[in-house]
Amino acid sequence: MRQFIRKARYYETDQMGIIHHSNYIRWMEEARIDMLNQLGYPYRRFEELGYISPVLHVECEYKKSVKFDDEVKIVVSLKEFGRVKFTLRYDIYNMSEGGELSAYGTTTHCFLKKDGRPVLIDKEMKEFAETMKTLSMEKENQ
């Protein structure tokens, strides 16, 4: 899979001249959307199938600040995959600082039908479940 790389923008900085903590969560979302697009599952496809995918939980641990114009690489991996929900891990590396780990975090998601009922991923979204399990196996083989 293609790596997700982006530059830190000036408007993302705070008064101290570093990237505001809330932007790391946005970057994680950008990387997640990019990963799903690469796997052939853009959000629009889920919506066309009648599913939504809310974020159930998000957390981020900050290790070292990122500054304006730094280039970051975000590596997304599958941490857990269950029948109803799955968790992704994000490792955010500052490539402008020699690839140093700047932050890491997780997001947990589920799928709901438009009427709000939960989806059993392994039964109702078998193709997606298999794709995600393949992603997990690729990580184990690295």
Would you name each region that the model predicts?
Residues 7, 59, 108:
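Short aromatic/hydrophobic contact patches that present stacked aromatics
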Residues 1-30, 34-35:
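Catalytic strand-loop segment that frames the active site of acyl-thioester-processing enzymes
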Residues 12, 16-21, 29, 59, ...:
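Anionic, Ser/Thr-rich low-complexity intrinsically disordered regions
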Residues 2-4, 37, 67-68, 79-142:
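HotDog/MaoC-like acyl-thioester-processing domains
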Residues 35-86, 100, 104:
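Hydrophobic beta-strand-centered segment that forms part of the acyl-chain substrate-binding groove
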